[in-house]
C-alpha cells in the first residue's frame, strides 16, 4: 500500500512541477523555476521508490498518463488553454491504455520474487 501512496505523491509532484514551469514562463519568475526543479526531482525520487513493488510498466504508465490528463485539465482551468475535441479524445485513449496496462499486469507474490532473486 505504501508504494501506491508513493506513486500518487510522485504524480502530484510531477503535476505541480510541470504547472510551476508554465507559471514561471508566464510571469512567475525564478520562484516558479525553483519550484519546478524541486517538484520534478521529488517526483522522480518517489517514482523510483514506488517501482520497488509496483511493476515498472504500470507505475510509469500511471505516473505519465495520469500526469498528462491532470496537467491538461489544470492547464485549461488555470491558464485558459483550450481543450479541443481531438485533445479530449486523445486523453480518453490514453486513459483506456492505462487501464489496459493495469489490468493486463499480474502481481508477483513476495515469495516468488525472493525465490527468483535467490536463484
Swiss-Prot record:
Keyword Cell membrane: yes
Keyword line: Cell inner membrane, Cell membrane, Membrane, Transmembrane, Transmembrane helix, Transport
GO biological process, one term: glycine betaine transport
Molecular function via GO: amino-acid betaine transmembrane transporter activity; antiporter activity; choline transmembrane transporter activity
Protein task: Catalyzes the excretion of spermidine.
Annotated family: Belongs to the drug/metabolite transporter (DMT) superfamily. Small multidrug resistance (SMR) (TC 2.A.7.1) family. MdtJ subfamily.
Name by which UniProt lists this protein: Spermidine export protein MdtJ
Organism: Cronobacter sakazakii (strain ATCC BAA-894) (Enterobacter sakazakii)
Lineage of source species: Bacteria, Pseudomonadati, Pseudomonadota, Gammaproteobacteria, Enterobacterales
Amino acid at each position: 500500500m505504501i508504494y501506491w501512496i508513493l506513486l500518487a505523491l510522485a504524480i502530484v509532484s510531477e503535476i505541480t512541477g510541470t504547472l510551476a514551469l508554465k507559471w514561471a514562463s508566464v510571469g512567475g519568475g525564478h520562484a516558479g523555476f525553483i519550484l519546478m526543479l524541486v517538484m520534478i526531482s521529488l517526483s522522480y525520487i518517489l517514482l523510483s521508490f514506488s517501482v520497488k513493488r509496483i511493476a515498472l510498466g504500470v507505475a510509469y504508465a500511471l505516473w505519465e498518463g495520469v500526469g498528462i490528463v491532470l496537467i491538461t485539465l489544470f492547464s485549461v482551468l488555470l491558464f485558459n488553454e483550450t481543450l479541443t475535441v481531438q485533445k479530449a479524445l486523445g486523453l480518453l485513449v490514453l486513459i483506456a491504455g492505462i487501464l489496459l496496462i493495469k489490468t493486463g499486469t499480474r502481481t508477483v507474490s513476495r515469495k516468488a520474487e525472493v525465490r527468483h532473486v535467490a536463484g
